[in-house]
Amino acid sequence: MTIDQLNQDCFCFSLDREALVHALETELGTAGVSEQLKERCASAFAAQPVFVGAEQLQRMAQVVQAVEAIVAMPAHREQVLATAPATARVAAVAAQSVFFGYDFHLDQGRLGLIEINTNAGGAMLNAVLARAQRSCCAAMDSLVPTRASVALFEQRLVDMFRREWRLSRPGARPLATIAIVDEVPAQQYLYPEFLLFQRLFERHGLRAVVADPSELHWRDGQLWHGELAIDLVYNRLTDFYLEQPGSAALREAWLQQGVVLTPHPQAHALYADKRLLALFSDGARLQALGVPEATRQLLLDHVPHTEIVTAAAAERLWAARRGLFFKPVAGYGGRAAYRGDKLTRRVWEEILGGEYVAQAFMLPGERRVEAADSSQAMKFDLRAYAYAGQVQWVAARLYQGQTTNFRTPGGGFAPVYSTVDASGNAFSHYGGEHASYIFLLDDGGAVHPLPHALYVALARQEALAPSLGGQTLRLADWYVRLKDGEPETVVNETYGLYEIDQQGRINVVKAPADAGWPTVAERERMRTLLFADKSTEI
């Protein structure tokens, strides 16, 4: 199967909910974090993975490095910082800034960098999610992240903060205290993640507090939280340039370089201002800046054309709006961003009166998932978490609507599973082919083989089964290794309950995990149908 086919036809669940709770409550978090996350972020985690080819992941890393190469150019830095706020013009900033988020759309193999964030959230949530993955079948065994890889990711997160300290304070004592700062943190949507970070730091011997910026004080050349001197601030504020009154102490500490602040205002100016996307997609400007041809071409191939909205271009942009997406230059989280084909004249006037860019619209990827009531198509984007030009982790975000959100049932962060085959083809395990065999089991003990293609069509609501209407059936999905095109061994069995309405539409029924298990007689009947009385053991 190809990557696109997997994203359309694989309905296997990879998220182990019990393991998720265990990771939140015991392994990474503290008691109560799981319930907080459930209350605040009910759609934080998707149950199914997104499949991405290794070639696309490699190109994402190359785009990250291309952006880094441009930002490192003195001419570019001078040009950008000349008009940036004072907090971005602080000289000799050594910290490189943690948690860059490079957000991509992937549409039928075409990859596009949609935006860059300099305080991307969700990294710890993805660490938790990775700990709760399970392999649904043998074909997935090599794709699910190992405990070792997840532990290494978490260690690298801590090492990243320690490196920020060493870069900013060469020769100083080791990092000791961290403040995780956001405005009214306990009211933030991702507050549970702040607690996970606090616990992560504490497990590695660092004192950590979660604080509102107004709780910080600048005195005696040191930033304080109460009586605790703060070495480093992990900055989750969307007050990117520390302009709000509540950020006054943090602003002064930053201007005086009395605290290590990461991410910091200079990084936002150099990377995240969306006007930079207009530069990255303009070959003439890149050439004038002295960007090498290979880097120019890489960016032109992977950054949708973007331009700054001006009054002079208003008539042309309005006429072309259906192919454009409009974003505020300092926006974040999809706020005040609009698809051009849905624009009203009133909103258009607001765009013209603000600071916006117009980006060529690029479709997000599509992942078909099995939700509570039916199969549905979800959009997805890809977020590459990066530090110092290196990708640390790639996650997907499943959603419905104009922009990414965590309000869609069945949506949220999803793990990215990738093949090692750069061609995008997947699964050649155990030296043979594999196939799924589907059976429906009724209350009378009868077993009905169901062609996999029909099952997919039913799950997608693209087909009906009126002859089965009005029943609740158990569904068995046997993942089978083939030999010479014939079933050889069952390598995984998945069961569930499905309700067929009077029109023949199939819907998932929420039920205990063992509710769909077959009887001994039913299982023997399936074995007979599958192997035609061969003696192969299951």
What spans do the regions from the language model cover?
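Preference for protein termini
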Residues: 1-538
